[in-house]
């Protein structure tokens, strides 16, 4: 739809692009000045629509063969085609003629970034900021390069500076939240975003990102309020419904979580996704009958949604219908065998069948998949523990422990695995962070062990 195509662009860009497509792309005749063509080309670059991009650049080159701005955009076409060396050579040749051109410096920053050369990218981006144009966007790019260097503290400073210059850059907002999570400084992010929504009370992205920060800080009720504000501004945002439903799930209010996702089905174009997520919600709660209903609804909307097929297969497995579970999962596998939900379902089915070697093969494929989620990692950890594959569990979970040293899930499994492999000193390291009730189920012997038992934290009394 036209509205969706130009959602993040102003009316002038929209009108120019539509006029270009109506005339030039249909062999018509129309004059555009060089500034207008730059805007048209930049639109196609932004949305990565390569065929009209090529046509727009070729048209501009015919009209303005000596324009350095058009030549810069020719280099960006090479970047879009991942021809980074060609783009770099074109830009360096232009830079020799105009060494102070900030557009050239910015473009060099882009290509150095694509070539994973962050130091050179930072140098060029900062040179590009000298003219004071789009400083917010440039600082956001500089921050991303520092993230690549794993210098998160400096990245956060540049993200905050970027927001000071351009408070409406939603990409910077999202990246800022993500970096605060990595650096474990969500308190700092909270202060910044609370100030941001005071200054920009109608920013859907601002309220949404503040909700994410509240989730990370464990302030679920405040997260719900923030997501509700975001939905009041924009009822068509599927990601806001998803996060609001997750917040309700964390509060234990499955009914509100489900109704939120059903509102997503009513108010957005993502009906199949909404029904699938309701199914996944009920599956996590162990309500396989309700889950199967909503997975079926999702498939009625989108017949080849393999994630919904995988969820339906897991529902059948929980119902005890192994044959139907396996046939449904195999159908999903025949469509997309690399889908993480399909791999997870196949692993669980073969685990339940007692074919642990085949289950392990599916889990091995799942864990190295780029789309593997935290939930999948936890399922894999539990699988390794149940089958006493302790050494592999330790190798896998220690990586998660290093990243999240106070996560009770991995600490609990590590403590039990260390105990069963007689690594008592290692167990002492993680015992302060375990879930005591879960540990007593996994490894009751550790609770009365003369050396380790006294180190197990006292269970917290239930909240009144």
Show which residues each predicted segment covers.
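TPR/TPR-like (Sel1-like) alpha-helical repeat modules
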Residues: 232, 368-371, 416-441
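Structural marker of alpha-solenoid helical repeat scaffolds
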Residues: 63, 96-98, 130-132, 165, ...
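Register position in tetratricopeptide repeats
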Residues: 46, 80-81, 114-115, 148, ...
């Amino acid at each position: 739809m036209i509205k969706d195509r130009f959602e993040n662009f102003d009316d002038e860009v929209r009108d120019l692009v539509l006029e270009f497509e109506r005339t030039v792309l249909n062999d018509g005749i129309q004059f555009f000045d060089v500034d207008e063509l730059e805007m048209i080309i930049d639109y196609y670059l932004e949305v990565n629509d390569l065929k009209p991009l090529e046509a727009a650049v070729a048209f501009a080159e015919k009209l303005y063969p000596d324009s350095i701005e058009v030549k810069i955009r020719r280099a960006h076409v090479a970047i879009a085609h991942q021809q980074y060396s060609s783009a770099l050579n074109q830009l360096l040749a232009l830079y020799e003629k105009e060494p102070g051109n900030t557009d050239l410096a910015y473009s060099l920053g882009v290509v150095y970034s694509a070539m994973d050369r962050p130091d050179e990218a930072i140098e060029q981006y900062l040179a590009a900021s000298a003219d004071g144009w789009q400083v917010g966007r440039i600082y956001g790019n500089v921050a991303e390069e520092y993230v690549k260097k794993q210098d998160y503290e400096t990245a956060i400073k540049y993200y905050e500076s970027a927001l000071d210059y351009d408070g409406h850059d939603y990409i910077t907002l999202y990246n800022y939240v993500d970096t605060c999570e990595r650096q474990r400084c969500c308190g700092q992010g909270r202060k910044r975003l609370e100030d941001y929504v005071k200054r920009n009370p109608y920013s859907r992205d601002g309220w949404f990102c503040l909700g994410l920060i509240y989730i990370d800080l464990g302030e679920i009720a405040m997260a719900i309020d923030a997501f509700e504000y975001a939905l009041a501004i924009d009822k068509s945002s599927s990601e806001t419904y998803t996060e609001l439903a997750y917040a309700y799930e964390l509060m234990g209010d499955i009914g509100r979580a489900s109704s939120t996702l059903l509102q997503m089905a009513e108010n957005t174009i993502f009906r199949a996704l909404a029904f699938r997520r309701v199914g996944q919600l009920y599956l996590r709660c162990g309500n396989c009958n309700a889950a199967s209903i909503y997975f079926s609804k999702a498939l009625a909307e989108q017949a080849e949604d393999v994630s919904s097929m995988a969820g339906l297969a897991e529902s059948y497995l929980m119902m005890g219908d192994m044959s139907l579970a396996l046939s449904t999962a195999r159908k999903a596998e025949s469509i997309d065998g690399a889908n993480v939900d399909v791999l997870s379902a196949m692993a669980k089915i073969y685990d339940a069948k007692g074919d642990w070697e085949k289950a392990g093969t599916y889990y091995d494929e799942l864990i190295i998949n780029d789309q593997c989620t935290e939930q999948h990692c936890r399922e894999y950890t539990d699988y390794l523990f149940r089958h006493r594959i302790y050494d592999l569990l330790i190798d896998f979970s220690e990586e998660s422990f290093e990243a999240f040293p106070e996560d009770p899930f991995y600490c609990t499994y590590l403590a039990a695995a260390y105990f069963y492999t007689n690594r008592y000193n290692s167990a002492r390291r993680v015992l302060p962070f375990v879930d005591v009730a879960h540990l007593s189920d996994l490894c009751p012997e550790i609770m009365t062990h003369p050396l380790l038992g006294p180190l197990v934290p006292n269970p917290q009394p239930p909240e009144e």
